Design a protein with these regions (language model features):
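Non-catalytic terminal extensions of PLP-dependent enzymes
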Residues: 209-213, 217-224, 228-230, 236-313
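PLP-dependent aminotransferase-like
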Residues: 19-73
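Active-site phosphate-binding strand-loop segment of PLP-dependent enzymes
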Residues: 62-107
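Active-site nucleophile and cofactor-binding loops and adjacent substrate-binding regions
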Residues: 1-7, 32-34, 236, 269
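Conserved beta-loop-alpha segment that forms the PLP phosphate-binding cup at the N-terminus of a helix
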Residues: 1-23, 40-43
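Active-site C-terminal subdomain of aminotransferase-like
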Residues: 122-239, 245-249, 313
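Pyridoxal 5′-phosphate
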Residues: 10, 55-59, 65-66, 77-78, ...
Length: 313
């Protein structure tokens, strides 16, 4: 399965939990920052749940604005650790307090960060809390096929209690063969991805993951410093493996096009317009070359922006 499946199953569990424990029916909604993954919209479409995307503040979840959007039909709050567009960890501790205050399910989407953040923290980086150490967090999704380095698709979803997890299960009957119970929507799932995920976790172990994630952070730090030295502005203060940056004078999408000409096939943000990198351990080896090409791309755009007065008086 992928991160979408983990998120969909967390939403399904939260919905059924809200029905059973709080009597919520019909017209349900989820309150989330605008930076959350579209998988929540998929879940909302499938289950007829409104997803209210609240504008972010300084690229992070705006907890006060999210609280203002809550009503009697709200079943879930969402935060990311980190969000995919900006690579920033939302203020999960504040969201946890809000979830407790309003008696709501809080899901943390750590599909990107779930298997890098713990090892980055072990390596001495002071990361914000986002896991079950935060009171109020009900469920967490994390992808092994991202920074767990497993084959696609291998995602996981965790619940604070067994009771909460049980609401994820599909339990159907009556049927001529009796009850049919599956942990997810899929009746049949391939075992190859599970075996591959087990193999890579056994092969790397804690020490292996710490070293891999150290290289990721080193690549991000090198690129962040280089970006700033070249006049780019990094969006927020990323601490993991994703970084987004813009330029105050030049269109980042034009720079992105120039980088593609030089063989860099990365990503870009549309709102705000920015360059976007999701870094791996190998990128630490090519960070200097990337910055050199970024500088060339910026210079090319700058020269094209200067009007020519040749042949004029």
């Amino acid at each position: 399965s992928g991160g979408t499946d983990s998120i969909v199953m967390a939403v399904k569990a939260a919905r059924d939990y809200a029905r059973a424990k709080h009597g919520l029916t019909g017209g349900l909604n989820i309150i989330a920052p605008s930076s959350v993954h579209p998988a929540f919209d998929k879940a909302g479409m499938m289950m007829d749940i409104e997803v209210r995307r609240i504008p972010v503040k300084d690229y992070l979840a705006d907890v006060e604005a999210m609280e203002a959007a809550i009503d009697e039909h709200t079943l879930m709050l969402v935060g990311s650790a980190p969000c995919f567009p900006f690579g920033l960890i939302d203020p999960i501790e504040k969201l946890g307090k809000l979830a407790q205050k309003r008696v709501l399910w809080l899901h943390v989407d750590a599909c990107v960060g779930g298997y890098i953040a713990p090892f980055v923290r072990m390596n001495g980086v002071d990361l914000p809390k986002f896991d079950f150490s935060v009171p109020g967090v009900s469920s967490i999704s994390g992808d092994l096929h991202k920074y767990g380095y497993a084959s696609k698709g291998a995602s996981t979803v965790f619940f604070r209690t067994k009771e909460m997890r049980d609401f994820m299960h599909f339990d159907a009957g009556p049927w001529p063969l009796g009850r049919m119970v599956t942990p997810t929507l899929a009746g049949t799932r391939p075992g190859g991805a599970i075996a591959a995920a087990w193999a890579i976790t056994q092969y790397l172990g804690v020490d292996g993951y710490r070293e891999k994630q150290r290289e990721v952070v080193a690549a991000r730090e090198t690129i962040a410093k280089g970006d700033r030295d070249l006049g780019f502005q990094v969006l927020g203060e990323p601490q993991l493996g994703i970084i987004a940056f813009t330029h105050p004078e030049h269109d980042p999408l034009r720079i992105y096009t120039e980088l593609m000409k030089r063989g860099w096939f990365t990503a870009a943000l549309i709102e705000p317009r920015a360059l976007h990198l999701m870094l791996s351990p190998k990128h630490n080896e090519v960070a200097a070359q990337y910055l050199a090409d970024l500088n060339e791309a910026r210079a090319t755009i700058r020269e094209e922006s200067i009007p020519s007065y040749a042949g004029t008086i």
